From Swiss-Prot:
GO MF terms held by the record: structural constituent of ribosome
Family of the protein in this entry: Belongs to the universal ribosomal protein uS2 family.
UniProt keyword list: Cytoplasm, Ribonucleoprotein, Ribosomal protein
Localization (cell): Cytoplasm
Subunit-structure text: Component of the small ribosomal subunit. Mature ribosomes consist of a small (40S) and a large (60S) subunit. The 40S subunit contains about 33 different proteins and 1 molecule of RNA (18S). The 60S subunit contains about 49 different proteins and 3 molecules of RNA (25S, 5.8S and 5S). Interacts with RPS21.
Role description: Required for the assembly and/or stability of the 40S ribosomal subunit. Required for the processing of the 20S rRNA-precursor to mature 18S rRNA in a late step of the maturation of 40S ribosomal subunits.
Origin superkingdom: Eukaryota
Keyword Cytoplasm carried by entry: yes
Protein name in the entry: Small ribosomal subunit protein uS2
Lineage of the organism: Eukaryota, Fungi, Dikarya, Ascomycota, Pezizomycotina
Cellular component GO terms held in the UniProt record: cytosolic small ribosomal subunit
TM segment ranges: none
Gene Ontology annotations of biological process type: ribosomal small subunit assembly; translation
């Protein structure tokens, strides 16, 4: 499956072929579109169509030469409505200077000059001809060339350059965009020669689930042991309301009982039971001594 229709300088290395196979770029769908048949290598017994990796590499180089031929990188528009390709097109645009449309393509971007998002690119590159059909349709109205990542079941109408690959897997999509960006930079001279390794790793082009990344950050920021519950926490005396304290020997020492303790009740305790109690502060007057008192 090695490419044979390219000049020796554009030949793929064994590492490139291994990366394409590892990312499963050669695995198509069970359906086959008639115009994608030349890129088919064989059909497996389970019905999966296998794409010729050599043809994939040839089309990557061809697409890179077309992109490098455009003087102004801002005249290139890269589009992906498929979530797995949105991160890849943003990275491709950042590294090559192209304009990225990640997410829903607003109808009229290429045909309605009244809209704020109106663009007049000289070339568009799409991730999936089926999900990005609106962009391809509008490009056909205004004669804009189209480069597309095409699976075995992808429609190729109005597609000028089809890169045969698996356009449904996150790793396959990211790898194709990464290789395309690397070849463009090599042709532009940003990379000194083909032996120079690109310092950008392919992982940056892979799709990442935002919820999974958020949960990962939350797990990393948790305080160790904060989630402990059960026997260990109960034994340590940390479970319960704030008024509960850990039991210790002699805990009742010095604890007053509400409703029974009277301040100073132990003062002036006498052991002589014959002694009379002290008279009250106010005593009754003697009627015989005071004649004014009448009974």
């Amino acid at each position: 499956m090695a490419p044979s229709n390219l000049p020796p300088v554009f030949n793929a290395t064994s590492q490139d072929i291994e990366m394409l196979l590892a990312a499963q770029c050669h695995l198509g769908s069970k359906n086959l579109q008639v115009h994608m048949e030349p890129y088919l290598w064989k059909t497996r017994p389970d019905g999966i169509n296998v794409i010729n990796i050599g043809k994939t590499w040839e089309k990557i180089v061809l697409a890179a030469r077309i992109i490098a031929a455009i003087d102004n990188p801002a005249d290139i528009c890269v589009i992906s409505a498929r979530p797995y390709g949105q991160r890849a097109v943003l990275k491709f645009a950042a590294h090559t200077g192209a304009v990225a449309i990640a997410g829903r393509f607003t109808p009229g971007n290429f045909t309605n000059y009244i809209t704020r998002s109106f663009k007049e690119p000289r070339l568009i590159i799409v991730t999936d001809p089926r999900t990005d059909s609106q962009a391809i349709k509008e490009a056909s109205y205004v004669n804009i060339p189209v480069i597309a990542l095409c699976d075995t079941d992808s429609p190729t109408e109005f597609v000028d350059v089809a890169i045969p690959t698996n356009n449904k897997g996150r790793h396959a999509i990211g790898l194709i965009w990464w290789m395309l960006a690397r070849e463009v930079l090599r042709l532009r001279g940003t990379l000194a020669n083909r032996e120079t390794e690109w310092d950008v790793v392919v992982d940056l082009y892979f799709y990442r689930d935002p919820e999974a990344e958020e949960n990962k950050e939350i797990e990393e920021t948790k305080v160790p042991g904060a989630e402990e519950v059960g026997a260990a926490a109960i034994e340590s005396g940390l479970v319960g309301d704030s008024w509960q304290a850990q039991a210790t020997p002699g805990f009742s020492a010095g604890v007053a009982v509400p409703g029974t303790a009277v301040p100073g009740w132990e003062a002036d305790v006498s052991t002589d039971w014959a002694a009379s109690s002290a008279p009250a502060a106010e005593t009754l007057a003697d009627p015989a001594a005071d004649p004014s008192v009448k009974w």
